[in-house]
Structure formats: structure tokens, C-alpha cells
Amino acid sequence: MHLSALLTLLPAVLAAPATIGRRAEPAPLFTPQAESIIADKYIVKFKDDIARIATDDTVSALTSKADFVYEHAFHGFAGSLTKEELKMLREHPGVDFIEKDAVMRISGITEQSGAPWGLGRISHRSKGSTTYRYDDSAGQGTCVYIIDTGIEASHPEFEGRATFLKSFISGQNTDGHGHGTHCAGTIGSKTYGVAKKAKLYGVKVLDNQGSGSYSGIISGMDYVAQDSKTRGCPNGAIASMSLGGGYSASVNQGAAALVNSGVFLAVAAGNDNRDAQNTSPASEPSACTVGASAENDSRSSFSNYGRVVDIFAPGSNVLSTWIVGRTNSISGTSMATPHIAGLAAYLSALQGKTTPAALCKKIQDTATKNVLTGVPSGTVNYLAYNGA
């Protein structure tokens, strides 16, 4: 991406009202705590107080050049920058910060065996039940976005309630992996779902190998913030993100912008058996961050922990839908997260639409307390419960 045209336009459309020209100090340049940085790719965040019409003018100039343009909840763009372009942008007063782009991956671990125990666990105070108890409102009137590898919408378990909505992976318009379909099944399939009447929308930000760029994931969140306002979701909009990577200011701000738009966001704590405070989007305070539990009421051995974790949910050996009309049992905080997204839809249908913060607190208040073993000090010992 070559931004010569943009850079001549920026002083006219992005300058703060009282200041045109270079800033006193360059805009921060962040490097995310990620395993794989994408060379010469950057995420540029505009200041929130820039007039929308000015931002829209910039978006028009970038449409054919940027990899992604953010124009809804998160304002900016992502793409390739030369050293000269990077320097010029950092000196512009309309730029909030710039961050190197990186790779994010799913938070699931594939396994071959398992049983559908999770629904029984979240509908009983004690472990061991194989019966799922729930109110028959079952998430009706809610829209749940699965920001993942996509959804196989034709799977019979979805009963026509699922839609593959949008792909941010070039040339891939199906779930060729299975992870997103599995998460969607835990949220709202007829057999394996927490909220069996919710509408399900797949937004593909991870490729068929389970990886995606930070910039593409921000695009997915920005898209959901806008799309959720156009759909008939009288009981609220929920998003589920079973993915994660090293700490990223831009990913966290993208998540915060999605929540600020009114969408409840459940995110995976991660599978590294470490404190989640240095991972994104798990460390974003406004998201509802989910750790994983096992069938024996222990913290799953892989689950991250720490003060950023809001709730635990079943995440080991979870049976759900898979691609090509099949089912599969897999483990990870990826599997715990859709339990919470489904529970958010379930409670929203049962009790009415509320704010994302109030809904996460409701999930915490309703949870079964202090039954999990292996939870480190400083981490909440809350296991999801639907109140049935």
C-alpha cells in the first residue's frame, strides 16, 4: 500500500480544529506482544475526537489502498507503510497511535473423545448431571455474532437460524476449519446449544488454518458494531471471540469500541496456563473474559487465569457441531467462551436487554461460587450457572 495521496490529504481532513501541522511528540508506535509480527504492516488509529465527516473523507481516499478501513466503532486503517509514510503519520496531530500488525490464532485444542457434559453443568449447582434445564425462551430475540473461522450455516443443528455473514479472509467464504461452527453450536444449536432459539451470525476473521491478522480481527469487530444496529435483535446483540494473542493496544481498543456500541462481548482467556493480563483481547476490561473448567470441577489444566478473568465455563472435551454436518469434541477456553455468549443470550431473552457491563455482572452474580479446584489466588472462582 502506497499512501502518497493519503498523506497529502491527511493535513486537510485529519488535523485537529486548532492545530494543523506536526505534533510536539510523534504518535506512539506500539509492538504487540505477539509471536508473529507481520513485516511492514501497521494499524493506524485515528483520534476519537476527529469529526466523522473528516474521517469519512479519509476512508474514501483509502478504500482502494488499505488492507482494511475502520469507520464505525474503531476509526483508522491498516496496511503496508514505508518508513517515510510511517514517519509522516506519526507526526500528524490526527493520529492517536500506530501499532505493528501481527498474527492471532484460535484458542482451542482438538481432541478425539469427550461427552456433552457442559450444558448439564451450567444448569445445575452440583457436577455430574447430564440433563440440561432451561427456560424455553432460550435466547429468542437475540443476535449472536461468532467472530471466528465462520459458520457452516447449512448444518441441520442450526435449524435455519445461522448465517455466514461476512469474511475478512481473501478467497475464503466458508468455514474450512470447523472451530467457528463448533463455537456456534455451543451457543445456539438445537442439541448442543445454550440458547437454542438465538440467531447466529458468522464473521470470518480467521483462515482455514485458524490464524488471522490483528488488523482483520479489528475489521470484524468494527463490522459487528455497525451490523448489529441493522438487525432485529430486540433482546440484544452478543459477540463471541474464541481467539487470542499477545497484548495489543489496537485489538483491546477495537474490543472496547465494540462493547461501547452496545454489544456484549465474550472472549477467551487463552490456553497457556498463565496470567491472561498480557494477552488480547482477554485483557480488555470491558469484555467478559472466560476461563475453562473440566468435568471434575477443576480449572482446565491449560486455562489462563488472573484478575482479568471474569467467569469460568465448561471448556474440556466439549461436544458440539462441526463442518460437513458432523460433530466433534474439542477443548480450550475457545469452548468455554461460547457457553458464556450463549448464557448472555439466554439471560437477555429471559430478563430483557441490558448493558454489556450489567450482563457480565449478572453472569458473575448468578455463578456457582468456590467449587472449582486449581484456581490460583487472585482469580475469581465463579462457574457459570443459568439460574434454572
Swiss-Prot record:
Enzyme class, broadest EC rank: hydrolase
Record-annotated Peptidase S8 domain positions: 116-388
Keyword Hydrolase part of the UniProt annotation: yes
Family: Belongs to the peptidase S8 family.
Protein name: Cuticle-degrading protease
GO cellular component: extracellular region
Gene3D superfamilies to which the protein is assigned, alphabetical: Peptidase S8 propeptide/proteinase inhibitor I9, Peptidase S8/S53 domain
PANTHER family hit by this protein: ALKALINE PROTEASE 1-RELATED, PEPTIDASE S8
Source organism (scientific name): Metarhizium anisopliae
Any one Pfam family match given in the protein's UniProt record, by short name: Peptidase_S8
Coiled-coil segments: none
